[in-house]
């Protein structure tokens, strides 16, 4: 009989991308040292483009110098994947979890992230699917609704998933999302006829779907972001 699994979830609101990256690095180090339990960051970012390890420059369709004019930042990262947009009105989840402790390999981990978003979409009557061989993320037909880009270091995960609730779609016009040409991007707002609740509720629902998919027995919600963000600033 396995021991109970607990997931600690931090609701962080809107966080600058680099600040969240530094926080993830700190938490990964602490998880490796068994100083913290499996942890999940639930947040949004100001408009930000990130490039993963499979990046190709031609998938950013405007000069980097033009990004400030549209109010966006660009950052190079060590996650998997190509170029992705992160911004307001997305549900972004960054799991910092030990794959060894839950008995998952890398592929099973990514597939479970996909299932989490698919299960969430079904709450609103949206039939989503995992990407095919040349696709990444989660799709509704041929339209992409959720992106996945992860990093695994010594069995500890970081980065994660971004699901489109109702982002400004103009930001996607400046990139080839995840390096896949000729595909549309969509959102929960566009795909459902259901009246959407607050984004806080949507974040909580997505977290619950993820916790269920990974068979966590308990979710501990942390409601005060200053407790983790302020500690980071003091170090």
UniProtKB/Swiss-Prot annotation:
Its EC number is 2.3.1.181. GO terms for molecular function: lipoyl(octanoyl) transferase activity. The active site is at 178 (acyl-thioester intermediate). The record marks 144 as: Lowers pKa of active site Cys. GO terms for biological process: protein lipoylation. It catalyses: octanoyl-[ACP] + L-lysyl-[protein] = N(6)-octanoyl-L-lysyl-[protein] + holo-[ACP] + H(+). Gene3D superfamilies: Bira Bifunctional Protein, Domain 2 (3.30.930.10). Keywords: Acyltransferase, Mitochondrion, Transferase, Transit peptide. Transmembrane segments: none annotated. InterPro entries: aa-tRNA-synth_II/BPL/LPL (IPR045864), BPL_LPL_catalytic (IPR004143), Octanoyltransferase (IPR000544), Octanoyltransferase_CS (IPR020605). It comes from the Eukaryota. Pathway: Protein modification; protein lipoylation via endogenous pathway; protein N(6)-(lipoyl)lysine from octanoyl-[acyl-carrier-protein]: step 1/2. Its main location: mitochondrion. In the reaction, the free carboxyl group of octanoic acid is attached via an amide linkage to the epsilon-amino group of a specific lysine residue of lipoyl domains of lipoate-dependent enzymes. Belongs to the LipB family. This is Octanoyltransferase LIP2, mitochondrial. The lineage of its organism: Eukaryota, Viridiplantae, Streptophyta, Embryophyta, Tracheophyta.
């Amino acid at each position: 009989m396995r021991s109970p699994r607990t997931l600690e979830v931090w609701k962080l609101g809107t966080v600058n991308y680099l600040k969240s990256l530094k926080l993830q690095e700190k938490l990964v180090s602490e998880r490796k040292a068994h100083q913290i339990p499996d942890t999940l960051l639930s947040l949004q970012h100001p408009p930000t483009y990130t490039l993963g390890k499979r990046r190709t420059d031609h998938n950013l369709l405007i000069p980097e110098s033009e990004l400030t004019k549209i109010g966006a930042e660009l950052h190079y990262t060590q996650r998997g994947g190509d170029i992705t947009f992160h911004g307001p009105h997305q549900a972004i989840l960054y799991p910092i979890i030990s794959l060894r402790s839950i008995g998952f390999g890398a592929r099973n981990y990514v597939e479970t992230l996909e299932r989490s978003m698919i299960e969430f979409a079904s709450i609103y009557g949206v039939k989503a699917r995992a990407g095919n061989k040349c696709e990444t993320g989660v799709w509704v037909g041929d339209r992409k609704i959720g992106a996945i880009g992860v990093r695994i270091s010594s069995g500890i995960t970081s980065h994660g998933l971004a699901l489109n609730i109702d982002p400004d779609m103009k930001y996607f016009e400046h990139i080839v999302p995840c390096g896949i040409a000729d595909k549309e991007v969509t959102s929960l707002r566009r795909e459902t006829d259901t009246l959407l609740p607050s984004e806080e509720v949507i974040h909580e629902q997505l977290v619950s779907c993820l916790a269920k998919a990974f068979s966590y027995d308990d979710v501990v919600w942390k409601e005060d972001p200053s407790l983790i963000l302020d500690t980071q600033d003091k170090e």
